Amino acid sequence: AVSWIRIALFGAPFILVTLAGNGWMRGVQETARPLRYVLLGNGLSAVLCPLLVYPAGLGLEGSAIANVVAQVVSASLFFRALFAEDVALRPVPALLRAQLGLGRDLIVRSLAFQACFVSAASVAARTSIAAVGAHQVVLQLWTFLALVLDSLAIAAQAIVGAALGAGEQAKARRFAWQITGYGLVFGVGLGLVFAAVAGVLPKVFTTDPGVLAEIPHAWWFFVALQPVAGVVFALDGVLLGAGDAAFLRTATLLSAGVGFLPMIWLSLAFGWGLVGIWTGLTLFMLLRLVTLVLRTRSEHWSVVGATR
């Protein structure tokens, strides 16, 4: 593991370039090119990884090298696209300060997410081996569907940001509720699909009877939360597009501190197991839902102009 990390760290700067490039292109409503760039890099990694691990005999280090090569390729494509724009590359201090402020709020928000999910994994691990296995199966599906639903958030960021930047406040508000409706419908659809495969899909991940017995304790929370997640992720995108990161930071901290974290540790104290952990996640999502809906109903988020 240590040797893998040492090699993989060389890819960290290129990952940051790729993330920045994705943000830039999404911000100007260009979604096809970043998809191609990332797919090309990941496709190359998928080809190189088995070749370097097995025929080349590099083992775990081979997979790290494949990842770094993919990250370099993706970052290079974004650099090439940037240079083709023929724009000045000289830093603008005022813009950097604004971005650092926005980044600070988003970093704090991300840390709150990580504190919650690390705590949940810790409590699941202390419950039983079967419980932590079941938790990880359902959590991986939750993360996968979060990325699927996040496609709405990406669209919302681009369109709301463009509308407010052009001074079209009414258009931004109208789209906010439109994308919320799409998120709700999408979430309901995903919930129904995963409710239908509840007896089949977990067996794809494990055949362990103990883990399979624990999975239903989290599964139905996961299914029921999909409509909530659809709305929450859509409104996340709306407010991010409006540059309302400070509110998102505060709402996430409040939801984590009042809902998720207390319930997780109460679950450990009283032996509630996965039911307690996923009740905590449910409270977290419901609190986020309430705060985001109230914020979007207000007029405070829809500030027109190039900057807030």
Task: Map each language-model feature to its residues.
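Helix-terminus/linker motif at the lipid-water interface of multi-pass membrane proteins
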Residues: L51-L58, L111-F144, A162, V200-P209
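Hydrophobic alpha-helical transmembrane bundles that constitute the permease/transmembrane domains
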Residues: A12-A20, W24, V28, L39-V47, ...
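Short alpha-helical transmembrane segments in multi-pass integral membrane proteins
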Residues: A1-P13, L44-V47, L51-I107, V160-L225, ...
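Small-residue-rich hydrophobic transmembrane alpha-helices
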Residues: I15-P34, V132-V197, V232-G243, F247
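Hydrophobic alpha-helical membrane segments of integral membrane proteins
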Residues: R33-Y37, G62-A66, T250-A251, T279
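C-terminal structured "cap/appendage" subdomains that terminate the fold
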Residues: L235-L239, G243-G257, I264-W272, G276
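Short loop-to-helix capping motifs
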Residues: E30-T31, G59, S128-I129, D208, ...
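Structural motif
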Residues: R26, V53-P55, P91, A124-T127, ...
